[in-house]
Amino acid sequence: MNYIPDWNEELAKKIAKSEFINMTPDHWEIIYIIRNFYLNFNLAPSIRILIKTLEKMKYNKKKCSSRYLLKLFPKNPIKQASKIAGVPKTNDCI
C-alpha cells in the first residue's frame, strides 16, 4: 500500500472493517502514532521501534509489548496497523 495523503478516520474504519478489526480508542492511539512516525521519518516503524516509541511516550508497560499489539492487530500488528493508518508497511529491517 502507498501513502494515502487524503486519509481520514472514515477511510480507516472501512479498511479496519475489511481486516475484521473493530476500532477502539486503543487502536486509534497506535494508528496515530504510526501516522506521526511516518510523517516524521517517511517510513512506518518496525514493531521493535513502535514498542520503543511507546516506551519513550511513557505508555503503560502493558501497552509496550508485542503481545498487546497482537491483541489489537492479530494477523500482523505492523502490517494491519500501517494499512489502516494509510502508510506503506515497513520492511522490518530497521
Swiss-Prot record:
Question: Which cysteines bridge via disulfide bonds?
Answer: none
Please name the catalytic residues of this protein.
Answer: 93
Against SUPFAM superfamilies, the record matches this protein to:
DsrC, the gamma subunit of dissimilatory sulfite reductase
Is Ribosomal protein one of the keywords UniProt gives this record? no
Q: EC number(s) for this protein?
A: 2.8.1.-
State the InterPro entries in the record. DsrC-like_C (IPR042072), DsrC-like_dom_sf (IPR025526), DsrC/TusE (IPR007453)
Q: What is its main location?
A: cytoplasm
GO molecular-function terms, A-Z: sulfur carrier activity; transferase activity
Subunit comment: Interacts with the TusBCD complex. Interacts with MnmA.
Its annotated function is as follows: Part of a sulfur-relay system required for 2-thiolation of 5-methylaminomethyl-2-thiouridine (mnm(5)s(2)U) at tRNA wobble positions. Could accept sulfur from TusD.
Concerning NCBIfam families, the annotation shows: dsrC_tusE_dsvC (TIGR03342)
Similarity-based family: Belongs to the DsrC/TusE family.
Name of this chain's protein: Sulfurtransferase TusE
